[in-house]
Amino acid sequence: MKLAFNKLLVASVVFTVLSFGLLLASLFTTTATTPSEWTILLPEFRFPVNKKQTTEQFLVEKIVHEHEEGEDVRSALYLTHHGYFMNAIANMKVTYRQKSYTVNDVCFKPHSAIFENVPAPENIDKLPAYFQRLLLEMQRLSPCLIVTPLNCFYDSYHIHSEISNWNASTDYLNRRLRNSYLEAIEEKDSRPYVKSTYGPELIKEWARHMFAIPSKPLSNFSKSDLYSRVKTWLSSIAARKKICADPMRSCDETLDAENYFNVCTVMQQINDYDERRKQRLKFQLEYGDEEFTTRLDCVEDREKFIEWMQERNLRDMLKLFASSVEIPDHKEIPNQVCDGIYHDLDTSSGLELFRGARSFSNNTSAYDTINVELGFMTPENLLTTMRHSDFVNGFESIWTIERARELLNEFRLALKVEVTKFSESRSSRRVKVTTRIVNQIEEEGSDEEMEYHMIYFILGACALMVALFAAFAFSEAFLTSLSMFLLRGFITGLLFIFLCKSGGLILIDSNFLCYITMHLAFNLVMTARVTFICYRIGGCVQSEKDFVKSNFSSLGSVPVDSLKEDSCKRHVQYVLAKYTKFQVAQDAYSEEPFEKLPKYWFLIAIVLVPVIGVYWFFIDSDVQKICIVLLPAFLIAAFEEMRVKNQLLRERRIKKAIQRLQKEENTRIMSRGEIDNLLSGNAELSGEKSHYESKQGVLHHGSAGGLFELSRSTYDVSLIMAYPNQMIRNLRLCALGAYFRLFKMKYCAVVVSSVAALLILLSIGLLFIPVQRSSVPKELQQDELSIDFAIPNVSSSSWESINEYLEEFNSEIDSITNLQTITNGRRVLINSTSKINNFLKWVDDEPISWYLTAPLTRPYRKTHLPNPFRFQFRYGFDSIQKSTIIDVVERIDTLLTKYTETLSFPKAIGFLYEHYHQKAVVWNSFAYHEIFAAAVLAGFFSIIVVFFSIGPVVLPTLAFAFFVVGNRLEIAAIVSLFSLEYHQCYTNVAVFVGFLAAWTPFCDLARFRGRLLYKDQTRRTPELATQRRIRVPHVAAVDTVQIFAIFLTATILLIVITAIIPQFRAFFIPTVILLITLLLAVFNSLAVSLAAYQMFEHEVRHCYHDQLQSLTTTGKVCDMTRKKLLPREEDLSIPMEEFSIRPTENTKHYAPRPIDNSDPPEQAADEEVVNQDPSMEAARRQYVEFTHRTTGMPIELINQFVDNFPVFNVPANFLPNYFALGGAPLDANNGVLLRQPGIAPPPRPNREEDEEERFGLGGGEDDDSYPSSGDDIGDPAKEQQEVTDDVATRYKEEEVRKKVQPAVPNYDDPNVPGPSNPVPRQVEQVSREAPEDSPNREPRILVYQRPPRLHEIPQISHGRNPLHDPPSMEEYVQKYDDPNQPPSRRADQYPPSFTPAMVGYCEDVYWKYNERNLPDNVPMPPRPRDWDQRRLVELPPPEDFDEVPPPGRSAIPIPPGAIRLRERRREQHLREQEARRNRPESPDDTPGL
């Protein structure tokens, strides 16, 4: 099989080239500019409701203090209350695996940026042990990341001191540092002694001693550099100026109850009433305090006693600030940068991350809420920190990522408990402040479990699909089909891993699940397709291998009149098997294939490039991944089908060789005189074994995997079409019967197609319906927004321009109200606009600021920036009102669009931003996006139809594209109505499944239509079939039904599983959407099949009606004779045995009867005697002269024709041809056809009863309509006498009529010479006198019948004047005899049953100018529908009597009589006009009731 004819392989190669082209384009786009997300018209959006907002380095837990009455919280009272809460968090502990952990162990510490490159795994082993110990202890003492308004005061120092244990356990810290120092020095060296109660002071002293120890030089850094980093760390944690939140207290006083034990023991040791009264005044106790404190135990009730002391302190503050509590004490805090101890070397400025405005927000009034943020390490960072600690301490690390997650979850749960307890404490109730966590605590391990559940679900769904297909589609070839399925999957996986990874990773997300779904469906469909061809259809073809040059015409004539509801299923099964065999036989055995590529297929392939490019650029930038997922299955299936067909052709050649050898062997045996042995059964056999062995009426091949054929005595195909089980067989039979009934229903196609089209149009309308989208629950809100920049190829020349654009961007985004700046690095970039080296110097000098303000920027070396240069600006929403956020989102989108080119596509990320962006912006353009995508895909599918189909037409192609993309629009409408996420995945799967469902039935129907309409271009064509006969495309439709029934079954089972198992609940909605997608795809596929079937059937009927005028055996004989007259060298001979014509003993010909009919039949039997009769010679001469005169044929050719028929002189063999063969009139193009006496002409069919059969898709064979013998023909002599008498009678009547009235030429009469009929065609009077030798002297009329013409249309002697001569229908029939001629443009103005010849006859110009002057025998044909409108348009305009002729002499002389006539008409017109003007008004003209 030639590669050019294997369309599937050519198409797969074309799409492979396009896919890799898109892949290269996406790679170049990603590396040269930005990630590929910017190329899509509508970005993907998701709802991360259950996910914490994370950055690259840490997790954030947000806590809110909210005043119940909306008072301003910028006062010492509420800041002091907030300080109590921070102390409670600092003392929080968690026990995990029998070990106690504090917040200091899990919090994120930005000061580690100072030593970012030092504790790296590749560098840590190169440091001395005492340096490693020093770095570990410095990391433990580093402050945690806490964003709080207390960063503006000295109070934050005490909080971090409590968390990091700066003043506690200094002896233990001192001992570990001293031991590491002593291990590094020799015994003779001095051993210093350091003592301090402040942890950082111990670090400072021991660092001075450790760096004085002589050691080997370090490779990656110097000791001086490391020591400078230690100094930087010490200066960065130094306390700021002592500005207290409570101006009435000293900053040295602690905010907690560190001396509570002394107070408690004093209160409980006093028993005397007077002493208690004195202590009450001393401690300022109120009523009830004494009783409360005396009941507490100083050891067991420590927390309750501290809580009471905090409440007492707040009571005192309320008394002091009672008159001015409504006036805030610290109104300037929102305008300050409160970084606390997070400052760098430059202590005069802080970090924008700790801007005061970020610590306050409003709920019911301005500044009624205090915001707190705690930074925790990510599980990965926590794992690295714990392993580093175990390594330095010399322990074997037992930490894993799962344990790190568990420890973080324990702290988050403990934080929730601590917040709840503090919100219910005495101090919170006193100041009416509610404390809560903004983000709900996730379930333990939910993210990780979700990933595992997704993997389990994907594997389970794949296994279920494969099992169902193996049981119900792969038949007995299970192992082969399964191996090919796994091979396709393995190759696809390898290509996807190597070509579709992003940054070395492949995310198992919704897109990955979409790719899995599409590949699984396509791989299963292609495996089933190849299985059908190889092991089911291929087996049926074997039965026709004996007929090496067979055109399989017998397969196209299976009547299905008995296929009713009560029909035999065995018979239906036989019909299905036979037509399956027929379909594959045409593809596998045709030396001249039916399915050819279009003439300019390479141009069509080029057109695919811009279409796919537009889809990739504007719709989905990951379309190359979809192509890579599908192409391996496509390519392997194409090669596998080519291999199977080549194998079948090779077996066919082997069969021919075996037959040739057997023929030669038989010839050799006959030549050796071994006929006796052959007849006696003792013939010499060849050495080969018998090729066939009989078994149960079916012949099987002896070798493995060889040929086998059906026995001709049975039609039991159970051994050939081996179905997996009876269920599949019944399903296919039911589907086949359902298709029969649907196609037989008259208006079924119109109803189904209309309903499907209305459903698609309704879906388009639903896309534009405004739907009220649900908002995010308030407790799940995250009011942060980050804008990520990734600027490629930053150089010294572009650095200044980038800073200018960033400055403009900052100024515009600062103008947006309700959006506060967290950090955008503006100060950093402005201070370093001169050179890039200034920025790199700032990165090295201020590591904390760099670490917090630009976490995405990591220069590999200090001399240049990474490519692309990544950094992040962070903002926060002041208000979480829906209208406010929508306004901010729209303005941010405008800014991002404005700076797309200059700042390389900045991208906004944030929970609230993405959520409200989806609600306010994305859904508004969702409808336009889907319609644009549908239009692009419709063009793509139209090109595919043109690429694959033979002779495509416009309407079926548009219908196919419309219904396939309609599946996407319907799913998009569902997504829009229910606001579903992952819309791109749903719509991609929808359009892909719709194409799979509709393509195979439509493609096979289009190919079958091409075989019927273009049968002249091929040598082997299926026979014409009436409307009651089975069509081949039903097989493809039944295969599609079988495949999608399996898909629907698997999807329903998955829905049940996801509804029952709680872990799979997240996949319930996607599975339901998949089920709806499959149902819509099947319905749209049915609509496509019915609509295309009706269009093709009408086209084929029209074609055969004009071409053959009959669909009986006669029509086939005419077609065969035409091929005989115009043979081609490459044509194969068409044996007569293929047609329903039986041979007879005698042969009769069309010819006129002899003149003398008085001789007895016995004398005519002797041929020689008759030939010598002079009367016969005279008759022969008269016949030749008449034929020459009427047809214009040369006399030599007529004599040669008469001489070739020796039975010409037998009078009984002359039959009149006034009737047509098969009951249909024949013209000259049919040639001389021989009539056989064994077959009589069938009766003319009834128009009303057999109209469907006459104009069906093809003409079938109807053996019952022909007689079995020649007796039904009748007596030829009697028939001739009747014709002669009838002609004589009509001749006499015509003579009488001519004498009465003058003759009017009747050009429609074929006997009247005219423009289209130069000579009479039927009757001519030869002689009115009787022959002299005849005994009967009465005049006799001799009638000659015009024989059929043998060659082209006779020449017309003169042309017809269309203005005076009426047209002839015969001329238009001859003019429109070409079936490939396009239809008339005026055909829509006439009934559908009108042929092109009839339309041309009605549109002749003669009827326009002779409407009122027609001859008597020329009737007016039917007028078109727009006749009235045309008459009004084409009528001459009214005469203008006021027209003044132009000056000068006219070029055409005007007769004087014409001028006088015009003047008389003008005067008459003026008189009538004046009379109408002077006419009195009629009373009837008066308006009234």
Swiss-Prot record:
Record-annotated membrane-spanning stretches: 454-474, 489-509, 513-533, 600-620, 622-642, 749-769, 931-951, 958-978, 986-1006, 1041-1061, 1066-1086
Domain of life: Eukaryota
Topology in membrane: Multi-pass membrane protein
Disruption phenotype: Null hermaphrodite mutants have masculinized germ lines, producing only sperm. Animals make incomplete male tails, producing shorter stubby tails that lack sensory structures called rays.
Residue ranges with Basic and acidic residues bias: 1275-1298, 1326-1340, 1423-1433, 1460-1482
Subcellular location: Membrane
UniProt keyword terms in alphabetical order: Developmental protein, Differentiation, Membrane, Receptor, Sexual differentiation, Signal, Spermatogenesis, Transmembrane, Transmembrane helix
MF terms (GO), sorted A to Z: transmembrane signaling receptor activity
GO cellular component annotations of the record: membrane; plasma membrane
Tagged with keyword Ubl conjugation: no
One record GO biological process: germ-line sex determination
Stretches for region Interaction with fem-3: 1138-1288
Region described as Disordered: spans on this chain: 1143-1176, 1233-1393, 1412-1489
UniProt xrefs under InterPro entries: Ce-Tra-2 (IPR032848)
Extent of the signal sequence: 1-33
Composition skew (Pro residues), residue ranges: 1444-1456
Stretches the record annotates as MX regulatory domain: 1402-1423
Assembly notes: Interacts with tra-1 and fem-3.
UniProt function note: Plays a major role in controlling sexual cell fates. Promotes female development in XX animals where it sequesters one or more of the FEM proteins to the membrane thereby freeing the tra-1 protein (a putative transcription factor) to enter the nucleus and promote female development. In XO animals it acts as a receptor for her-1 which prevents it from binding to FEM proteins thereby repressing the activity of tra-1. Negatively regulates male development when bound to fem-3 and is required together with tra-1 for promoting spermatogenesis. Also required for feminizing tra-3 activity.
Protein name: Sex-determining transformer protein 2
Native organism taxonomy: Eukaryota, Metazoa, Ecdysozoa, Nematoda, Chromadorea
